[in-house]
Amino acid sequence: MSVMFDKIPTQKYNYGMILTYSDIVKKETSVRKARKAIFDKKYLKIGHGLYCQDIIDYDSLEVIFSRYKNIIVTLNTAFEIYDMVDRNSSKYTIATVEWSRVITSINVDQIFTSKKYFNIGKTKMLYQGFYIYIYDKERLLIELIRNKHRFPYDYYKEVVNSYRKLFINHELDINKLRKYLKHFTYGNSILSRIMEVIV
């Protein structure tokens, strides 16, 4: 049985079980045994060079991070992971550096980002048993304002309300936000718009 990458389901399963061919060789102790194990369907192919031991042993976000290295979770998917919205998107929203190769998976919404801004607010998170890179809440607030046109009005308001709660509870680092915005064109204007909506 082969599960191709562009048809990976979006449901959550057990985590941290993605294996490369090299992992299988180490686990089976030889190339011959590894090939036999794959032939005997002990390991299921879920993408180019990626395997799992059981169809329920992987999550599609884990596969994405196994296959593409220089990516960051952003916008809709990040808002969901941070519990800032009460809904689930059908696609994962992933930021890559501009001019990166196109991610061809049907369940990825790829956002091309200027190299100048790409790593601002990037943080490593243990998520469902595997590590991902995701923008912190301060960087996401900047992206929310910069990309307001991407969102339906009710979705945008839901995220804004979550940020208002963070601000009221002193869980939003305004100094960090100001520091980030020094790197952005029209940073002062973005800050003014942010303060208008969250205060």
Locate each region found by the language model:
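Charged, low-complexity surface patches
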Residues: 13, 26-27, 67-68
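A short, conserved structural fragment
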Residues: 40-47
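Nucleic-acid-binding surface
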Residues: 19-23, 50-199
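Short amphipathic alpha-helical interaction segments
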Residues: 26-39
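Active-site-proximal helix-loop elements at catalytic-domain edges
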Residues: 39-40, 89
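Residue-level preference for nonpolar/small residues embedded in alpha-helices
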Residues: 4, 16, 29-30, 71
